[in-house]
Amino acid sequence: MQAAVASKTNISLKGSTEIVTEFFSYSINTILFQRGLYPPESFTRVAKYGLPILVTNDQSLKDYLDNVLKQLSEWLLSGDVQKLVLVITDIVTKEVLERWVFDVTTDIPKEGEAPRQKPEKEIMNEIQAIIRQITASVTFLPLLPNACTFDLLVYTSKDLAVPQKWEESDPKFITNSQQVKLRSFTTTIHKVESMVAYKISND
């Protein structure tokens, strides 16, 4: 009788960083598309995590995201990222309407420690579940006004120097908000827990 064996993948700090950075890239694109912050025609469909995912083909947005993710990747590698937050704001009223929060816990392997192991398929399935939840969020999130913008906030270790072109920010919390916890995933080195907070209408 044959036994099916789930192949384990050795997880390095560099490999884990690449997985998490890529997840953030696809998550941000999915949120921007699902919440209608950019025209649907400015997105291209790709296959990732066993799902169809829409990614931007707007060059200025791609450049912005590439710059943020490059810096984020460096901070993930050094264990300095605490959370990534995507904030959606009403352009007219400047009111914060949504906060997509990705909390990051890092457990960097110690020198001489045996390689961490986890099946790659298991990690991909965990990520797939989060992307599915982001896509399904339109069923419960309030409609956004026509003119909205977004910011990306990265919470880091306090003693970390802020690079040029980056600036300190307030947390951009939402007054009168509802929170929905989403799923999490772990590479065994980085754990990402996600949630969305949205403004409750006063109507």
Swiss-Prot record:
Keyword ATP-binding belongs to the record: no
Subcellular location: Nucleus; Chromosome, Centromere, Kinetochore; Cytoplasm
A GO cellular component entry from the record: kinetochore
PROSITE patterns: HORMA (PS50815)
Entry's Gene Ontology BP terms: cell division; cheating during chimeric sorocarp development; mitotic spindle assembly checkpoint signaling
Domain notes: The protein has two highly different native conformations, an inactive open conformation that cannot bind cdc20 and that predominates in cytosolic monomers, and an active closed conformation.
This protein's name: Mitotic spindle assembly checkpoint protein MAD2A
